[in-house]
């Protein structure tokens, strides 16, 4: 009596299929049916069968080696599953046979004017969070555990020194009780990241990674899939932004701002003391770990560069900065980057004791609506790269500092950041500064009658009403600026070790108070009476490095060596520097300009390296353009409208 047919299941890396066989059939009889269900370039002699997935330690046998073996002899029953492994024919896969190129059927059908068109490789589109390059600091903080360790609680712990209970187990970095106890108002960025990632990517689900962060987007999406005309001709619920509900941001991208030396602040204040006008400068430094806050980040300021500007009693106006890229390049050679901006808002109290008027306090404002809009524009120009965001970037580490009077009449520093929502609202042109510094205005679509490209969504915020209840309010026409502001801490190191140890070189763009950068200042700093250590100390000045860069006397390698001498101050590097052709060119320029050049033996003009010729007019150096502050004296505001003018109109989004 013939046996009833059985169904066997087969699985390969191409998928699964079933075959109906007789128990008395032999294994090699399945080869034609198996080849029909595998790719065409499979080598038939490489087909392998196994009782487990290929490569996991099962009993793997070549199909050709099972000649004479039937299914009933190995105990296979109805519904059993076998795993198939195979190798592809490399010669056919690469399109070669016996050393000749053989076009495939697909290539043969692809022709242009009778000539075959080779098929191009398919470009793999990767997710932004897979290819983005984070900073080394973020990579280091991502690897940290971040939990807050606690000691034994003598009141509640009942176990030994090696035990652990609920009263002494480590806390998460976002634990609300710990933050309230330490009076930490905002979570650090990486603590906030741990908090939201714990609910987005749960380890027990074994699901694929999804970035927990997403940047807010308050503009009309141009890539709407609904098929209607683009805005402003058409709009739907898929492309229009949702209503905005403002609330104070619970985290901050940077927790602390540290100035490496008090001289940085004093040099900026000197301009106000001499002119009575305000001043603005960009902060250059690094980002480091801030251990006072769980997984915290601090911005360490090493230098302040003052760009071209027009300074007035009530504010400043930024002008075009022609050498912006050059200054950033010098900072990069010194291991620095632009990390923030600082400006003064000072008014003398008139008592003759150096006290100033306190304009920023709890009953007025801390950062005006105009300054928040300026900070938001600056942060939009310096986004933060992170693999935890769907777009590959989120927020910004750019900080904004203000020098103003406190309630005691002393000059103090305050550090802030605009919230992530504030940056997007400014980018989407939803808000605009108000004449009242403590409120921000919401734009109206009626104001844009000529250009209908702007869409203003509904904006709401919550406040405590007259009955003591938190109620939702419509933000139009204005709302408090506190909803767009994040406060940071600031301070100075206990043991100061600034990167640049000299600050005697004149600061740039100060011709309005009679200070300019000239070659005579370079000559004076380099005349060190034969002491190399003093010369190394002299070039350790960021403003001098930027001035030397403008002379174009050093090539890239020599300038990198100069910046290394300025930051590391190694005597060996200093001696190597003075024997470079660029240094010889600098000495020649000083001689031709009539300035006093260095005359000591340690600063000779090296004979093997003839000085390079550079385009330079002796005794004359080009000054900033007519738009710079060197041609304008600080003036007092003549009307109320000038006092309320947009003082930072020079800054704009790219």
Curated annotation (Swiss-Prot):
Q: Which residue spans adopt a coiled-coil conformation according to this UniProt entry? A: none
List GO molecular-function terms, semicolon-separated. ubiquitin binding; ubiquitin protein ligase binding
What membrane topology is given? Peripheral membrane protein
The Gene Ontology biological process annotation of the record reads: mRNA transport; protein transport; ubiquitin-dependent protein catabolic process
Q: What PANTHER family is this protein classified in?
A: NUCLEAR PROTEIN LOCALIZATION 4, NUCLEAR PROTEIN LOCALIZATION PROTEIN 4 HOMOLOG
Q: Which gene encodes it?
A: npl4
Q: Chief location of this protein? A: cytoplasm
Q: Which domain of life is it from?
A: Eukaryota
Keywords for the protein's UniProt record, in alphabetical order: Cytoplasm, Endoplasmic reticulum, Membrane, mRNA transport, Nucleus, Protein transport, Translocation, Transport
Note the InterPro entries from the entry.
MPN, Npl4, NPL4_C, NPL4_Zn-bd_put, Ubiquitin-like_domsf
Q: Where in the cell is it found?
A: Cytoplasm, Perinuclear region; Endoplasmic reticulum membrane; Nucleus membrane
Name the GO cellular-component terms: endoplasmic reticulum membrane; nuclear membrane; perinuclear region of cytoplasm
Segments carrying the region annotation (Disordered) are: 592-654
The UniProt family comment states: Belongs to the NPL4 family.
According to its UniProt entry, this protein's organism is Aspergillus niger (strain ATCC MYA-4892 / CBS 513.88 / FGSC A1513)
Role this protein plays: Involved in the import of nuclear-targeted proteins into the nucleus and the export of poly(A) RNA out of the nucleus. Has a role in the endoplasmic reticulum-associated degradation (ERAD) pathway.
User: Where along the chain is composition biased (Low complexity)?
Assistant: 620-631
Q: Which residues form the MPN domain?
A: 257-394
**Which PROSITE patterns does the entry link to?**
MPN
Q: Pro residues composition bias: which ranges?
A: 600-613
Do you know which Pfam families this protein is assigned to? Answer: NPL4, zf-NPL4
Q: For bias kind Basic and acidic residues, which ranges apply?
A: 632-645
Disulfide bond sites: none
* Stated name of the protein: Nuclear protein localization protein 4
């Amino acid at each position: 009596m013939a046996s009833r047919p059985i169904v066997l299941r087969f699985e390969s890396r191409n998928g699964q299929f079933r075959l109906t066989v007789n128990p008395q059939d032999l294994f090699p009889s399945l080869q034609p049916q198996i080849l029909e269900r595998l790719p065409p370039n499979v080598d038939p002699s490489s087909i392998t069968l196994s009782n487990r997935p290929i490569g996991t330690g099962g009993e793997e046998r070549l199909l050709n080696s099972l000649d004479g073996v039937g299914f009933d002899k190995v105990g296979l029953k109805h519904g059993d599953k076998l795993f198939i492994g195979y190798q592809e024919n490399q010669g056919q896969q690469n399109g070669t046979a016996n050393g000749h190129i053989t076009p495939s059927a697909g290539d043969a059908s692809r022709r242009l004017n009778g000539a075959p068109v080779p098929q191009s490789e398919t470009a793999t589109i990767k997710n932004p969070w897979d290819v983005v390059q984070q900073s080394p600091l973020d990579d280091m903080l991502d690897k940290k555990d971040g939990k807050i360790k606690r000691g034994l609680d003598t009141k509640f712990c009942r176990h030994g020194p090696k035990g652990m209970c609920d009263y002494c187990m480590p806390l998460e970095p976002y634990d609300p009780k710990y933050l309230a106890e330490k009076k930490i108002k905002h979570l650090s960025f990486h603590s906030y990241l741990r908090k939201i990632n714990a609910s987005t990517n749960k380890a027990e689900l074994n699901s694929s990674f999804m970035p927990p962060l997403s940047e807010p987007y308050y503009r009309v999406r141009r890539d709407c899939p609904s098929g209607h005309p683009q805005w402003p001709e058409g709009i739907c619920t898929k492309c229009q932004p949702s209503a905005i509900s403002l609330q104070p941001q619970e985290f901050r991208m940077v927790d602390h701002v540290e100035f490496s030396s008090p001289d940085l602040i004093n040099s900026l204040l000197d301009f106000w003391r001499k002119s009575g006008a305000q001043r603005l400068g960009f902060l250059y430094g690094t980002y480091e770990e801030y251990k006072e806050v769980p997984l915290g980040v601090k911005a360490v300021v090493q230098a302040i560069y003052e760009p071209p500007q027009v300074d007035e009693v009530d504010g400043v106006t930024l002008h075009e900065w022609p050498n912006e890229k050059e200054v950033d390049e010098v900072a990069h050679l010194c291991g620095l980057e632009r990390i923030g901006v600082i400006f003064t808002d000072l008014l003398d109290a008139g008592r003759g004791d150096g006290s100033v008027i306190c304009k920023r306090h709890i009953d007025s404002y801390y950062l005006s609506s105009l300054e928040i809009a300026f900070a938001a524009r600056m942060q939009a120009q310096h986004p933060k790269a992170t693999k935890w965001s769907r777009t590959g970037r989120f927020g910004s580490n750019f900080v904004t500092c203000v020098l103003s009077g406190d309630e005691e009449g002393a000059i103090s520093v305050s550090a802030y950041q605009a919230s992530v929502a504030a940056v997007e609202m400014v980018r989407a042109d939803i808000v605009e500064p108000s004449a009242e510094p403590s409120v921000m205005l919401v734009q109206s679509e009626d104001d844009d009658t000529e250009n209908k490209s702007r869409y203003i969504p509904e904006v709401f915020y919550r406040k405590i009403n007259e009955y003591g209840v938190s109620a939702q309010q419509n933000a139009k026409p204005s709302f408090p600026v506190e909803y767009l502001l994040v406060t940071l801490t600031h301070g100075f190191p206990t043991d100061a070790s600034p990167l640049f140890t000299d600050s005697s070189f004149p600061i740039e763009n100060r011709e309005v108070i009679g200070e300019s950068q000239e070659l005579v200042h370079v000559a004076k700093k380099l005349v060190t009476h034969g002491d190399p250590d003093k010369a190394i100390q002299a070039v350790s000045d960021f403003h001098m490095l930027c001035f030397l860069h403008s002379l174009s006397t050093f090539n890239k390698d020599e300038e990198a060596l100069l910046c290394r001498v300025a930051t590391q101050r190694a005597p060996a590097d200093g001696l190597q520097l003075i024997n470079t052709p660029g240094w010889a060119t600098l000495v020649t320029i000083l001689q031709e300009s009539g300035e006093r050049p260095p005359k000591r033996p340690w600063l000779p003009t090296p004979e093997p390296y003839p000085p390079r010729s550079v385009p330079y007019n002796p005794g004359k150096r080009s000054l900033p353009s007519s738009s710079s502050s060197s041609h304008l004296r600080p003036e007092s505001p003549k009307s109320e409208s000038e006092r309320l003018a947009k003082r930072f109109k020079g800054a704009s989004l790219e």
